[in-house]
Amino acid sequence: MKNAFKDALKAGRPQIGLWLGLANSYSAELLAGAGFDWLLIDGEHAPNNVQTVLTQLQAIAPYPSQPVVRPSWNDPVQIKQLLDVGAQTLLIPMVQNADEARNAVAATRYPPAGIRGVGSALARASRWNRIPDYLHQANDAMCVLVQIETREAMSNLASILDVDGIDGVFIGPADLSADMGFAGNPQHPEVQAAIENAIVQIRAAGKAPGILMANEALAKRYLELGALFVAVGVDTTLLARGAEALAARFGVEKKLSGASGVY
């Protein structure tokens, strides 16, 4: 078993990605052909569940782009289900300390290394037990990325980096800026200083730093500092802003929804 994304990070090859929030296998396949190294299937802020994640994994599978899946929380039951449907690389949100990082790793490993439940006869990941020795190979193929998104997590970064089985640390600029008192302004100088310091610290520890940044100049700056997995856009944003720009070029006035109140 191989994990091409994990291998690329270990080799120090920067991986450029795109965030998928449309929660749709058709759009996932369309974007899988765009050439990105990785695609993030978002189960935290997009309307995904195990079934929709599965269909997107199936849609991406024929293409070189590598899927990364973000569960809604650091929950061993949800992690187990995502691994069974075929996710190999997980981005675990809102990890605050080393204990939570260790729990994330344990959820991805079969015993005795972890607590992942054994259900390979039912699992797409094992090709329904058609992969010889899957139970003994799976642990090494898992790639665990944890998100640090608060001042507390930043203060615990050194101990998080010491956790065995953590392959990368992703800095969440939106939540971090909010926690630092600059909600909606991840480009604030104090936030940027925290991000840049974290990237250098993560790389120095031999782990892969990652981030989502649609600002092209900043994304390139993070890559120069040593970031190894950088998402440079979001599908919903590309569609929304692209559609608005096209309408504006033809003089169409932007209108708010006609619905009033909750709909």
UniProtKB/Swiss-Prot annotation:
The keyword 4Fe-4S is annotated on this UniProt entry: no
Residues under site feature: Transition state stabilizer: R70
GO biological process assignments: 4-hydroxyphenylacetate catabolic process; phenylacetate catabolic process
GO annotations of cellular component type: cytoplasm
Entry keywords, A to Z: Aromatic hydrocarbons catabolism, Lyase, Metal-binding
Residues the record lists as binding substrate: Q147, A174, D175
InterPro entries for the chain: Aldolase/citrate-lyase_domain, HKHD_aldolase_ent, HpaI, HpcH-HpaI_aldolase, Pyrv/PenolPyrv_kinase-like_dom, Pyrv_kinase-like_dom_sf
HAMAP family referenced in this protein's UniProt entry, alphabetically: HKHD_aldolase (MF_01292)
Family of this protein: Belongs to the HpcH/HpaI aldolase family.
Protein name according to UniProt: 4-hydroxy-2-oxo-heptane-1,7-dioate aldolase
Species whose genome carries this gene: Salmonella newport (strain SL254)
